[in-house]
Amino acid sequence: MDVVLDVLDTFVFDKLYALLLPAKSFDLLDQDSVVDYNSHINRYVTLTPSQYAVESSLARDNILRQFLSLFITIWAFGLLLYLTTASLSFALVFDKRAMQHPKFLRHQIRLEIGQALRAMPVMAALTAPLFLAEVRGYSKLYDFPTGSPFPLYTYLQYPLFIAFTDFAIYWIHRGLHHPAIYKRLHKPHHRWIISTPYASYAFHPVDGWCQSLPYHVYPFLFPLQKAAYLGLFVFVTIWTVMIHDGEYALDSPVINGSACHTIHHYYFNYNYGQFITFWDRIGGSYRRPNRELFDKQQRLQQTEIQRQVEEMERLVKEVEGSDDRCYEQDTKKTS
């Protein structure tokens, strides 16, 4: 993130802070030469800082400025990536017939987006300290493959990242289903029994932050190339949208894809993993998706939907006690 911050400082934040918090004339003499700025990005490509780099009372290395800049960056980038990927998935992939399911909520799309938009600034504020620690040099991130522990690690870092984060998220997610925690933190995400791509970030903000922690903790524990970290950050966002897209293209006993995660939303206590089914199998929480899900005709047959609804209603009563959701079909019946 230090490389990203160099770029954003040069093109956005230097001028913004100079306008909002201009430096006094004697402060300008105390600041380091602009020659030392952009040291992170300059390892890749030369980027000359503008005159604004020294014209703010908050220098680039000021911890408050770095926190604010990271907060804005995480929020804006996360929002853009969420809206773009979820909208593309909804338009091109999501089976709109799912919106006719008896458990699809009234105004659900609007509610999902609203929940995500409210959660994102809080999640960004909670995540910014971790990125701040990275920027200030406390992580094990490195720039080039030559900085890896050994040559093969350049390739191993990806499966190692997936393995570590999937293990950690499994236990965090399973913990969020504990009765003492579920209703306060995780229930808002399970409001969407029939999820759409917009449900991917429709969390309680603390829930979303908890489940993202393994991604941000990883580079403090293990070496990771900076470019790989940014790429994995984008991949995780897209993957989170994909497992809510309702397109069950992958019938795999290993990959925890959309079908597996749909079972989790349907029936609550299964398939807690994020990427693979290994820890669900070890923990006894794996449930193989029904064959009907992979057939576009059978999945919407009345007998299959009725079977789903009966089990859903039983489990909602078991897990939540009562169902306070407002379903679209119930609204139509009373109108």
Curated annotation (Swiss-Prot):
A GO CC annotation given for this chain: endoplasmic reticulum membrane
UniProt short sequence motif Histidine box-3, positions renumbered to this chain: 261-265
UniProt superkingdom: Eukaryota
Biological processes, Gene Ontology terms: sterol biosynthetic process
Compartments, as annotated in UniProt: Endoplasmic reticulum membrane
Consequence of gene loss (knockout): Does not affect the susceptibility to amphotericin B, itraconazole, fluconazole, voriconazole, and ketoconazole. Leads to the accumulation of the non-C-5 desaturated sterols 24-methylcholesta-7,22-dien-3beta-ol, 24-methylcholesta-7,22,24(28)-trien-3beta-ol, and 24-methylcholesta-7,24(28)-dien-3beta-ol.
Residues covered by the Fatty acid hydroxylase domain: 160-284
Glycan-bearing residues: 256
Motif (Histidine box-2): 186-190
Entry EC no(s): 1.14.19.-
Keyword Lipid biosynthesis found: yes
Record membrane topology: Multi-pass membrane protein
Transmembrane region(s): 74-94, 113-133, 152-172, 219-239
InterPro entries for this protein: Fatty_acid_hydroxylase, Sterol_Desaturase_Related
Sample GO molecular function, one term: iron ion binding
Motif (Histidine box-1) on chain: 173-177
Pfam families associated with the record: FA_hydroxylase
Cofactor: Fe cation
Domain notes: The histidine box domains may contain the active site and/or be involved in metal ion binding.
Similarity annotation: Belongs to the sterol desaturase family.
More about this protein: In Aspergillus, the biosynthesis pathway of the sterol precursors leading to the prevalent sterol ergosterol differs from yeast. The ring system of lanosterol in S.cerevisiae is firstly demethylised in three enzymatic steps leading to the intermediate zymosterol and secondly a methyl group is added to zymosterol by the sterol 24-C-methyltransferase to form fecosterol. In Aspergillus, lanosterol is firstly transmethylated by the sterol 24-C-methyltransferase leading to the intermediate eburicol and secondly demethylated in three steps to form fecosterol.
Function recorded in the entry: Delta(7)-sterol 5(6)-desaturase; part of the third module of ergosterol biosynthesis pathway that includes the late steps of the pathway. The third module or late pathway involves the ergosterol synthesis itself through consecutive reactions that mainly occur in the endoplasmic reticulum (ER) membrane. Firstly, the squalene synthase erg9 catalyzes the condensation of 2 farnesyl pyrophosphate moieties to form squalene, which is the precursor of all steroids.
Name used for this protein in its record: Delta(7)-sterol 5(6)-desaturase erg3B
Lineage, highest ranks first: Eukaryota, Fungi, Dikarya, Ascomycota, Pezizomycotina
Gene field: erg3B
